[in-house]
Swiss-Prot record:
The chain crosses the membrane at residues 7-27. Substrate binds at residues 117, 151, 276-277, 292, 369. The gene is NA. Disulfide bonds join 91-418, 123-128, 183-230, 232-237, 278-291, 280-289, 317-334, 422-447. Gene3D superfamilies: 2.120.10.10. It comes from Influenza A virus (strain A/Turkey/Ontario/6118/1968 H8N4). N-glycosylated. Keywords: Calcium, Disulfide bond, Glycoprotein, Glycosidase, Host cell membrane, Host membrane, Hydrolase, Membrane, Metal-binding, Signal-anchor, Transmembrane, Transmembrane helix, Virion. Glycans are attached at residues 50-51, 57, 62, 69, 145, 269, 399, 417. This is Neuraminidase. GO terms for cellular component: host cell plasma membrane; membrane; virion membrane. It comes from the Viruses. The influenza A genome consist of 8 RNA segments. Genetic variation of hemagglutinin and/or neuraminidase genes results in the emergence of new influenza strains. The mechanism of variation can be the result of point mutations or the result of genetic reassortment between segments of two different strains.
């Protein structure tokens, strides 16, 4: 074999060996891939080895031992859902301590603050929020003109953190509404906003911002709701709806709601009673509401119901009357409205029952929505006399008040084995009592404490008129 033939033979052998080696490598890679694929995608019946891998869940700090042979599959765990539960009474209260004050009108003279009415507060386990009905306008702006009107297509329910002036930068849209309620069941927020024409208004229910149900006006006469928080217990939320005249017999429904879906409706048989704008709170396993009688009563009607929607109704017995306008304190009634020529109209308000006693929130003025005070009547839930056992001043009679309502802070937040009673007071400014082109309000909130408190005056404090009014 000559040298050239040797070179050709050696080269051919090298190429063959290289090709064989490459094929073996490819075969090995395919075998490894196929084996890995089967292990990941097919179920394993054999016992796992003792290899241990820790994983960290972003929702909660939750380190879990996962034993496997080859692969760790990371799956998010469900959050620890806590629903508000029933069974707690109201915490004992000696007086009322300031919780928040937003000063919205004062700040709005030079800041971007919404024109609002009907503010109310509601708390989840982690935060308290102020809900309010806007007019689609800002203070000291031309669109604030004429905002004394209650119902318009521009009104929306929005919310912001409690204690801050409501502005576009800190507020969250909730619902298109000129009447509303909202509450948390623990994991989520329920909102109910009523909008539309007076004769065919519709309530739109949302759970965590998603539309879940609707309810149409059944009497065709300004269907309306609480203008304060609904109440949630044991995964269900409860609210009251009114439809019918504001100055005659109207019609009422209790709604039972789960995750935004209406699961039960109860018509309230309340001939001679008038329930509007009820302020509700949890009371043991029940829900208790104190409402506005816009027809005949200067005393406030109440309704108490359980989870089956079985209910009782009556009037706050005390001769210390809670509505406005009202007569001077006198003889109350437990079962019928007290008129004395002052029973018509009214204002949203609240009371808290403690056994036979009752804390009554009310304006200081008999005729106008000015001033505010908390009055303790130790027998006022069962006795019709006018004897009070203590008064705490909130706003002096030279400053405007307005609507007021109840809310509560639950034991799941505080760790106490009771429900903390709280209330808010709206301070209406502008029309119809002041020379402005607009109507709006700020709010202040208090919670019950079983320790020392003080009375004072915490008014709105804004200097009117604004530039837009001149």
């Amino acid at each position: 074999m000559n040298p050239n033939q040797k070179i050709i033979t050696i080269g051919s052998a090298s190429i063959v060996l290289t090709t064989i080696g490459l094929l073996l490598q490819i075969t090995s890679l395919c075998s490894i891939w196929f084996s890995h694929y089967n292990q990941v995608t097919q179920p394993h019946e054999q016992a796992c080895s003792n290899n241990t891998t820790n994983y960290y869940n972003e929702t909660f700090v939750n380190v879990t031992n996962v034993q496997n042979n080859y692969t760790t599959i990371i799956e998010p765990s469900a959050p620890n859902v806590v629903h508000y539960s029933s069974g707690r009474d109201l915490c004992p209260v000696k007086g009322w301590a300031p919780l928040s004050k937003d000063n919205g009108i004062r700040i709005g003279s030079r800041g971007e603050v919404f024109v609002i009415r009907e503010p109310f507060i509601s708390c989840s386990i982690s935060e308290c929020r102020t809900f309010f009905l806007t007019q689609g306008a800002l203070l000291n702006d031309k669109h604030s003109n004429g905002t004394v009107k209650d119902r318009s297509p521009f009104r929306t329910l929005m919310s912001c953190p409690m204690g801050v002036a409501p502005s576009p930068s800190n507020s969250r849209f909730e619902s298109v509404a000129w009447s509303a309620t909202a509450c948390s069941d623990g994991p989520g927020w329920l909102t109910l906003g009523i909008t539309g024409p007076d004769a065919t208004a519709v309530a739109v229910l949302k759970y965590n911002g998603i539309i879940t149900d609707t309810l149409k006006s059944w009497k065709g006469n300004i269907m309306r709701t609480q203008e304060s928080e609904c109440v949630c217990q044991d995964e269900f939320c409860y609210t009251l709806i009114t439809d019918g005249p504001s100055n005659a017999q109207a019609f009422y429904k209790i709604l039972k709601i789960r995750k935004g879906k209406i699961v039960s409706v109860k018509d309230v048989n309340a001939t001679g009673f008038h329930f509007e704008e009820c302020s509700c709170y949890p009371s043991g396993t029940d829900v208790e509401c104190v409402c506005r009688d816009n027809w005949r009563g200067s005393n406030r009607p109440w309704i108490r119901f359980n989870s089956d929607l079985d209910y009782q109704i009556g009037y706050v017995c005390s001769g210390i009357f809670g509505d406005n306008p009202r007569p001077v304190d006198g003889i109350g009634s437990c079962n019928s409205p007290v008129n004395n020529g002052k029973g018509r109209y009214g204002v949203k308000g609240f009371s808290f029952r403690y056994g036979d006693g009752v804390w009554i929130g009310r304006t200081k003025s008999l005729e106008s929505r000015s001033g505010f005070e908390m009055v303790w009547d130790a027998n006022g839930w069962v006795s019709t006399d006018k004897d009070s056992n203590g008064v705490q001043d909130i706003i002096d009679n030279n400053n405007w008040s307005g609507y007021s309502g109840s809310f509560s802070i639950r034991w799941e937040t505080t760790g106490r084995n009771c429900t903390v009673p709280c209330f808010w007071v709206e301070m209406i400014r502008g029309q119809p009592k002041e020379k402005t082109i607009w109507t709006s309000g700020s709010s202040i909130a208090f919670c019950g404490v079983n320790s020392d408190t003080t009375g004072w005056s915490w008014p709105d404090g804004a200097l009117l008129p604004f530039d837009i009014d001149k």
